[in-house]
């Protein structure tokens, strides 16, 4: 029995399902999860000592690679001064100033410890600001595990949402309306029916949890116009795509200014950190200034802030995002070319440092499109690549990530492994 198997069996005795986040359990793809022993740059090593090229990067935060020396040094500098204080620090001001500088739509920002906290708090703030209750989200977009966001579409376009998780009361779900992503007509119909009831629309401008699906400019511009017309708060959930699609996030890429933005992953540099921020007149409704309560013992944790600040400074290097996008595009195009040469139906897309792999002929534009992917073939591909030392997301519904540490050698090795994997799929 491998060390990974031994650890997984042991973990299941004390941790539900053996993991602390469901996708890690390999339920979708089968087999034994890899327990990570250490990581460096573009690689990690599992409990059996096998090395993998890592295209998850802790699900997005490791944009400069694992254990970057500048990030490590920043963390080491603050450790000797204390791990957590429950009081303000100068570093909190510095990271807030950095975020506001890089994302112009953010006039003020509040630090939290997870993406779920960020979206949950942003929705509460939007409701407090507008005095309304209804939330609009989109099928396939994941915004964390707050009750009001674990909701799927009802049987009709404008029906109340239905809970997708046990433990979510129907009375909570009924305040969430779920529409099809990239469907402008559905959006217009919803606003025509109850636009003046909508507190907020929350959207991933580049979705990453139904695999990678880009918002179309038409769709996102319609969102902005309709929210403005009806007084609803437009929330961009950029926990995943923030600082990855562009230095100023997807909103910079599309040239669209949301009212509130949720950030995470990259701003913690691998540590637990997230944030939400936006217009000053909205943010002023937060306690202690206003009546919308939000708090957190570890919010603005000095160790996490140090890692995040170091990462944000590294990604401002001239040409950083252009180089990252070029690498990611080379990977996506190379995989598509290898599949085409092997005669395997496959498509790929990339934007900034994110990519998507689909066992379909066309790049998807909605969750319904994503569900047409050949899941069995994806699972086989995943394990063939895993055996070859390449670690993609263990689910056909997750985006992948490239870091600045991925070099030509890692990309070449990945494409060589893919050539063999696609040939095996065709056989």
UniProtKB/Swiss-Prot annotation:
Name this polypeptide is given: Glutamate-1-semialdehyde 2,1-aminomutase
EC code(s) of this entry: 5.4.3.8
Isomerase is among the record's keywords: yes
Organism: Burkholderia thailandensis (strain ATCC 700388 / DSM 13276 / CCUG 48851 / CIP 106301 / E264)
Subcellular location(s) of the protein: Cytoplasm
Swiss-Prot/TrEMBL GO biological process terms: protoporphyrinogen IX biosynthetic process
Subunit structure, as described in the record: Homodimer.
GO MF term (any one): transaminase activity
Pathway: Porphyrin-containing compound metabolism; protoporphyrin-IX biosynthesis; 5-aminolevulinate from L-glutamyl-tRNA(Glu): step 2/2
Main location class: cytoplasm
Keywords: Cytoplasm, Isomerase, Porphyrin biosynthesis, Pyridoxal phosphate
GO cellular component term of the entry, any: cytoplasm
Gene expressing this chain: hemL
Family (UniProt): Belongs to the class-III pyridoxal-phosphate-dependent aminotransferase family. HemL subfamily.
Coiled-coil positions: none
Cofactor dependence: pyridoxal 5'-phosphate
């Amino acid at each position: 029995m491998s060390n990974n198997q031994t650890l997984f069996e042991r973990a299941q005795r004390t941790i539900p399902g053996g993991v602390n986040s469901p996708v890690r359990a390999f339920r979708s793809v089968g087999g034994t999860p890899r327990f990570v022993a250490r990581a460096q740059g573009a690689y990690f090593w599992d409990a059996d000592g096998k090395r993998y090229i890592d295209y998850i990067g802790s699900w997005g935060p490791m944009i400069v690679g694992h254990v970057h020396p500048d990030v490590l040094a920043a963390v080491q500098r603050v450790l000797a001064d204390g791990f957590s204080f429950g009081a303000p620090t100068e570093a909190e001001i510095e990271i807030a100033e950095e975020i506001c500088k890089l994302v112009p739509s953010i006039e003020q920002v509040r630090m939290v410890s997870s993406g779920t906290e960020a979206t949950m708090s942003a929705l509460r703030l939007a409701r407090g600001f507008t005095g309304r209750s209804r939330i609009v989200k989109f099928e396939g977009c994941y915004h964390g595990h707050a009750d009001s966001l674990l909701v799927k579409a009802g049987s009709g376009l404008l029906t109340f949402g239905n809970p997708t998780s046990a433990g979510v009361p129907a009375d909570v779900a009924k305040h969430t309306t779920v529409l099809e992503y990239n469907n402008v007509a559905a959006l217009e119909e919803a606003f025509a029916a109850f636009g003046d009831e909508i507190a907020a629309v929350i959207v991933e401008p580049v979705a990453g949890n139904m695999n990678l699906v880009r918002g179309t400019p038409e769709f996102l511009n319609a969102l902005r116009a309709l929210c403005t017309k009806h007084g609803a708060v437009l929330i961009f959930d950029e926990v995943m795509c923030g600082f990855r699609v562009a230095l100023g996030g997807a909103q910079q890429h599309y040239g669209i200014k949301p009212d509130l933005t949720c950030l995470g992953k990259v701003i913690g540099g691998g540590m637990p950190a997230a944030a939400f921020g936006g217009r000053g007149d909205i943010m002023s409704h937060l306690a202690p200034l206003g009546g919308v309560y939000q708090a957190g013992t570890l919010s603005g944790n000095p160790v996490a802030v140090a890692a995040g600040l170091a990462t944000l400074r590294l990604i401002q290097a001239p040409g950083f995002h252009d180089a990252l996008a070029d690498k990611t595009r080379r990977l996506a195009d190379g995989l598509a070319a290898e599949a085409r040469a092997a005669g395997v139906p496959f498509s790929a897309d990339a934007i900034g440092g994110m990519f998507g792999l689909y066992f379909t002929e066309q790049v998807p534009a909605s969750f319904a499109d994503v569900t047409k992917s050949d899941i069995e073939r994806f699972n086989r591909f995943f394990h063939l690549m895993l055996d070859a030392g390449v670690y993609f997301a263990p689910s056909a519904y997750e985006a992948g990530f490239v870091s600045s540490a991925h070099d030509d050698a890692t990309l070449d090795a990945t494409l060589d492994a893919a050539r063999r994997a696609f040939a095996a799929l065709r056989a």
